[in-house]
């Protein structure tokens, strides 16, 4: 299964990608911002999950989520937002935009695992509200 990780921090992309690899997900694409992510998404029809930061240049994560959700072929794609924006208002805004799950940085690999399992329907359901 191909996943797309979007973050303007190369360090954060590496952390997320390494965690996903340890979880058995070897096919991970990376983008630095929403414009690059959109380009990769439209050129890689087999991307199944989008993991995106919120605050990025050119097109932020919230704008990316709205653009993805506006396309019928992506309406069911699981989206996880990984961000420092941890306020209740931000979480609600992201969920209303179409994010399926939300992780506040910093986070542990276990949290990413649980959130990914939750959006894929493969986990026990624990950790869905973190």
From Swiss-Prot:
Cofactor note (record): Binds 1 Mg(2+) ion per subunit.
Keywords: Chemotaxis, Cytoplasm, Flagellar rotation, Magnesium, Metal-binding, Phosphoprotein, Two-component regulatory system
Domain of life: Bacteria
Compartment list: Cytoplasm
One GO CC annotation: cytoplasm
Primary site of residence: cytoplasm
Job description of the protein: Involved in the transmission of sensory signals from the chemoreceptors to the flagellar motors. CheY seems to regulate the clockwise (CW) rotation.
Protein name (record): Chemotaxis protein CheY homolog
Organism, as annotated: Campylobacter jejuni subsp. jejuni serotype O:2 (strain ATCC 700819 / NCTC 11168)
């Amino acid at each position: 299964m191909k996943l797309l990780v979007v973050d303007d921090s190369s360090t954060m992309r590496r952390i997320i990608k390494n965690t996903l690899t340890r979880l058995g997900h070897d096919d991970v694409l990376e983008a630095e911002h929403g414009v690059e992510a959109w380009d990769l998404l439209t050129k890689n029809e087999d991307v199944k999950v989008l993991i995106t930061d919120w605050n990025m240049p050119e097109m932020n994560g919230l704008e990316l989520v709205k653009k993805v959700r506006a396309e019928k072929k992506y309406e069911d794609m699981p989206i996880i937002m990984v961000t420092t924006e941890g306020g209740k208002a931000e979480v609600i805004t992201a969920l209303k935009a179409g994010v399926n799950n939300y992780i506040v940085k910093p986070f542990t690999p276990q949290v990413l695992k649980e959130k990914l399992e939750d959006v894929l329907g493969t986990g026990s359901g624990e950790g869905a509200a973190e």
